[in-house]
Curated annotation (Swiss-Prot):
The keyword Cytoplasm applies. InterPro entries: Tubby-like_C (IPR025659), Tubby_C (IPR000007), Tubby_C_CS (IPR018066). This is Protein king tubby. It is a peripheral membrane protein. The lineage of its organism: Eukaryota, Metazoa, Ecdysozoa, Arthropoda, Hexapoda. Residues 67-92 have a biased composition (Low complexity). PANTHER family: PROTEIN KING TUBBY, TUBBY-RELATED. It comes from the Eukaryota. GO terms for cellular component: ciliary membrane; cytoplasm; nucleus; rhabdomere. The modification Phosphoserine is found at S144. One of its GO terms (biological process) is protein localization to cilium.
Length: 455
């Protein structure tokens, strides 16, 4: 070989070895990737980068190759300088864009959360319409169960001509136990047994003391009894609640009663605490107990029958006439109460005290000095409706065998108590002197109880 040619080949080999040893050799693939591709592809190609040496060698066995996951992409330009800059800034741009996107989404979510209540608060209230009372009630909030009545309770309250009653003898209520001079059982005016001449009573003092105090003379207490039959066993053992009706649909809780399950005879517990209807409760006021046939009921206070200092007192006795022949008609009931003293207090009578007789024993012996006897007012037969009717003065709206009015034989126009149905589980109960709330409620409970020999 020519010496000069051999020398040139050695120089070329040395030059090639020097170029292979140079680190700038890796950048050559960028130029190769940036060349125009075939007609089936575009002028640019999607490349993927990662945090490491910038090796873009297209070998399928390259350990540095990162498969595409469509998470981030860059387009290469035709110049080598722009390719280098895009490759070096690829990760930082992707990270910044993701952080900005997350921050922007978070800021929008926070704006939505903060702006919604502001929008609601800033919206003015709509003007009052014709139903302004309803709108005002909505703004003030719903009242609790112990303060208001359901709309269904008052649905038939003022409906005239619907009640199964017929005006019979109507007389003005009187005070001090003296009946007006009138006659023939027919009133000369618009006042009735529950007329407007009396004032409606309100709760005075604590509930536990109020329910035991006799009603003042000349005061009428309008109450409502609600029967709760919801629950597992309340179909057989419902709970009864007594409320005093007030103006504007309000009411005040007075008493609650329930029938004891484990008892040989009907036995009702009465309490002024609606959450605890038991004998051991602090609000225990008394009980109602019947005989085996359900024809006689005795009302007791909360005293202990075995105590000598404060023995249990008899508050009332309710007797239902037996109906063994099964004649259809209204119930006949007799109510015996303790007599009243000159200062309008009950005479203390205790069947638990061996030194004296109870109310029932006094009545059986016709010893009427310290007891008062009441009877249900006799209904009038109406040929048009083919039913027995009484004038409840708009307080009773549905016919029921439980409806009754209690009067004294000396003045049948002075209605001491009346009770009747207004809906399936709602009843009205009005009482006057000499009854107290406990006595009236117990009399009403006796009307609910089943009676074997009376129906």
């Amino acid at each position: 070989m020519h010496p000069q040619l051999h020398k040139c080949r050695q120089l070329m080999d040395a030059y090639i070895r020097q170029k292979r040893a140079s680190p700038g050799m890796v950048q050559a693939s960028d130029l190769q990737m940036s060349r125009p591709m075939s007609g089936m592809r575009g002028n640019s190609r999607e490349l993927h980068a990662y945090d490491g040496p910038m090796q873009f060698i297209g070998s399928p066995h390259n350990p540095d190759q990162i498969l595409s996951n469509n998470s981030s992409s860059v387009h290469l330009s035709s110049s080598m300088n722009s390719s280098r800059n895009n490759s070096n800034n690829l990760r930082s741009l992707s990270t910044i864009n993701q952080e900005d996107l997350i921050e922007e989404i978070s800021s929008h979510e926070l704006e939505d959360e903060e702006s919604s209540p502001v929008t609601v608060v800033e919206n003015p209230l709509p003007p009052l319409s014709a139903n302004s009372a309803h709108s005002q009630r909505l703004r003030n909030g719903q009242q609790s169960f112990n303060e208001t009545l359901d709309e269904d309770d008052y649905a038939n309250r003022n409906i005239a001509g619907v009640a199964p009653v017929r005006p019979a003898g109507i007389a003005s209520p009187y005070k001090d136990g003296v009946a007006p001079e009138a006659s023939n059982g027919v009133a000369n005016g618009s006042n009735s047994g529950v007329g407007s001449a009396e004032s409606e009573g309100d709760v005075i003092g604590s509930i536990d003391l109020f329910v035991m105090q006799p009603a003042p003379q000349g005061v009428l207490y309008k109450c409502r009894i609600t029967r709760d039959r919801k629950g597992m066993d309340r179909g057989l053992f419902p709970i009864y609640y007594l409320h005093l009706e007030r103006d504007y649909g309000k009411k005040i809780f007075l008493l609650g009663g329930r029938k004891r399950k484990k008892s040989k005879t009907s036995n009702y517990i009465v309490s002024c605490d609606p959450t605890d209807l038991s004998r051991n409760a602090d609000g225990f006021c008394g009980k109602l107990r019947s005989n085996v046939f359900g024809t006689s009921f005795t009302v007791f206070d909360s005293g202990n029958k075995d105590s000598t200092e404060s023995p249990r007192l008899d508050l009332a006795v309710i007797i239902y006439d037996t109906n063994i022949l099964g004649f259809k008609g209204p119930r006949n009931m007799t109510v015996i109460l303790p007599g009243m003293t000159e200062d309008d207090q009950r005479v203390k009578i205790s069947s638990a005290d061996p030194k004296q007789q109870g109310i029932l024993d006094l009545w059986k012996m016709k010893n009427m000095d310290n007891i008062v006897e009441l009877h249900n007012k006799t209904p009038v037969w109406n040929d048009e409706t083919q039913s027995y009717v009484l004038n409840f003065h708009g307080r009773v709206t549905q016919a029921s065998v439980k409806n009754f009015q209690l009067v004294h034989d000396s003045d049948p126009e002075y209605i001491v108590m009346q009770f009747g149905r207004t809906s399936e589980d709602v009843f009205t109960m009005d009482y006057r002197y000499p009854l107290c709330a406990m006595q009236a409620f117990a009399i009403a409970l006796s009307s609910f109880d089943g009676k074997i020999a009376c129906e």
